[in-house]
Amino acid sequence: SLVYNGIRTLTTQTIKVMSSTITKFFASFLAYGVANKKKRFSAIGRFSEGLAPVKGKIQWGYINKEYDVVIPLMYERAFSFKEGLGMVVLNSQYGFIDHTGQIRIPFKYAAAHSFEQECARVCHDGLWGLIDRQGNYILPPTYSQMEQFAEGLALVSLHNKVGFINKKGEVVIPLEYDNGCSFSEGLAAVCIESQSSKWGYINKDNEEVLPFKYDIAEPFYNNIARVGLYGKSMKINKQGSECL
């Protein structure tokens, strides 16, 4: 949500996230009720690739759709499988296992995200990089922040500047902005302090599409974005015209 001139408004993206969260909650709630008839688990995650993460009293493992434990409850945390690998935590380190519970990528990361389109974001010594499914670095730990890939690009941050990289780890848009949002519908909202900390929109060629004049700018959804301008919260289209 946005707070603008003391008024809180729900954005389109906020509503989408809320709807998705509610759907996932009820799916997990129903699965939990079936799997937990004998009070075997204290928590259950979402089924993915035939398995769901579950928690006993303290530790996590995985069950199949017959609600049998197929990967022992031995982890500090376990996440839903993606692209054949499950992200798990052991001794406060993140690693990845396959459907049989075999370790495929060792436990050596301080933080990580599940695989998406053949790569995963991992953190080591306070910096984020990218690995492939074999655990090889596509991009060594380099950035202080790395957002989820959107439309093939990820927002990254280093030394209080942000830019964008591709899935090869190559810098596509230089780290020359002071703040930014992930790409959506071909455009990204970015902020430049030298432009009075105003926000504008760029395309994937780093060309300015909408000028740096907004106090607040959010990603586009269905060709509409919410912005703040001259003390007013409004919706604009991709030409910068206000939408009523």
Where on the chain are the PLM-derived regions?
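Charged/polar low-complexity intrinsically disordered segments
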Residues: 13-16
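Residue-level detector of conserved, function-critical positions
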Residues: 22-244
